[in-house]
Each structure stands twice: as C-alpha cells, then as structure tokens.
Amino acid sequence: MKVGIDAGGTLIKIVQESQQGRSYETKLTTNISEVIAWLNANTFESISLTGGNAGVIAENLNVDATIFVEFDASSKGLGMLLKEQGHHIDEYIFANVGTGTSLHYFDGKQQRRVGGVGTGGGMIQGLGYLLSQITDYEALTNLAQSGDRDTIDLKVKHIYKDTEPPIPGELTAANFGNVLHNLDVDFSPANKLASVVGVVGEVITTMAITVARENKTENVVYIGSSFNNNPLLREVIEDYTVLRGFKPYYIENGAFSGALGAIYLN
C-alpha cells in the first residue's frame, strides 16, 4: 500500500493506493496528530507528502517520508484524474480552490504558477460566519444553496430595466450592490451566504479566465476542497466561465490531486 498526503492549512487529504484500488479520505488539519499516529501504527510501501504542513508530519514519523512541492504534485495528480475521467486536453489553466486560490498554467509538459487570489473556502467560512454566526462549513454551505442573490447583488439587468443591455443581463455589476435599494427587505442568512459564495466564485472565475486569455487557452480546470458539499460554488463558477466564453472542467476528487500526484512523483 502506498499513501499520499496533502497536508493543507485547513484540510488533510489522504490517498491510499494498491493493486486492489484507490481510496480517498479527508481529515481536519487540527487533527494532524491523529494522522501522524495512524502513519506510525501502520506499514506502507511508501509515504509521500505535500502541502504546507508536510514538514510537521515528516518530522514526527518513525519512518522515512518524501516531501514534494505542492504545485508539482497537484499538476501530476490532476493530469491523471483528467485522463481517468475522459478529459483529453493538452493545455489548460487549473485553479486550485482551497482556503485561498492558486492559479497555474499547464503547457502539456509542466505547470507554471501564474497567479493567485485570497478568495476561496477561507472567505466563505470566515465572512459566512460574520454574516450568519454559523461555524460549521457543511451547515453554512447547505444553507447557502437555498439562498437568492437578487436582492443583494446588483446585476446588469437591474441597471438596464427597460432597455437591452450591451452585455448579458445576468452578469453581476456589483456584488452586494443592491442592498441599499432593498432596505425594506429581510435579508435572510441563506441569501447573505448565497451572495458570499457568489462573490467568491465570480472573483475566482475572473482571475482564472484572465490568465487563460493571457496564456491563449480556452480550457479552465477547477479543483479543490472548497467544492466539497458546495454545488452552488460549482454552479456559479461553471456558469460564469461559460458566460465569458471559456470551457470549464470540474474534476471529481480533484481536491486529492496533490496527494495522488505525490504518490506518483515518488
């Protein structure tokens, strides 16, 4: 059995692979001591680590482990998952949406980091808490799914009420820009959270398609743990990517790209 671990700032992603198959598991980074104890209590053919807390795990193991650069590991694992899921694209931007978001260009041979932005799961959870007092990510994203952004976000269609707009009416003109026009409305926690997910998704997409245009590719691949239990984020990102004329790809188990890639870089 080989094990690959991507120890991030919020979550630890674990992939185990053998001739019998592959398994995926997630642990909170606050439980890193449990992961270390589990590794020390079992025997593995190899232990491959990546992510910001990889060093913490490695220095507490009773056996040797190999640490790989997170970006290279994610690129390797993503390439495998793309092929396994039938996506045969040679070059693309990939956005790794974790606590924050890192953007990379893959040219068919290697990845190059081309940018990043502080919006991601951390903003959803942090700003989401400030607006709703909900600390649990799953409860927060569950509530966001039922929200309506129309009374909070100002869209192009709200500005061009009686005339044909020069750009698609569903585009957001100003996130949270419709609030002062609707002060007589009860802004429910669900609507607030939906708008938080909306701004996160739109900022990530805008950054991703900007670097896609700069690198002359129409393909944008989205991975990361922020999509866990968050179909609204996926919907916002995919719809906005298409609306801007690019091709979005969402990869199942994409959050485990780093852990999987670390195994195969070893």
Swiss-Prot record:
Transmembrane segments: none
Chief localization: cytoplasm
Protein name, as recorded: Type II pantothenate kinase
Organism in which the protein naturally occurs: Staphylococcus haemolyticus (strain JCSC1435)
Catalytic EC class: transferase
Biological pathway: Cofactor biosynthesis; coenzyme A biosynthesis; CoA from (R)-pantothenate: step 1/5
Top-level taxon in the UniProt lineage: Bacteria
GO cellular component: cytosol
Gene Ontology MF term list: ATP binding; pantothenate kinase activity
Its biological purpose: Catalyzes the phosphorylation of pantothenate (Pan), the first step in CoA biosynthesis.
Protein family membership: Belongs to the type II pantothenate kinase family.
Keywords: ATP-binding, Coenzyme A biosynthesis, Cytoplasm, Kinase, Nucleotide-binding, Transferase
GO biological process: coenzyme A biosynthetic process
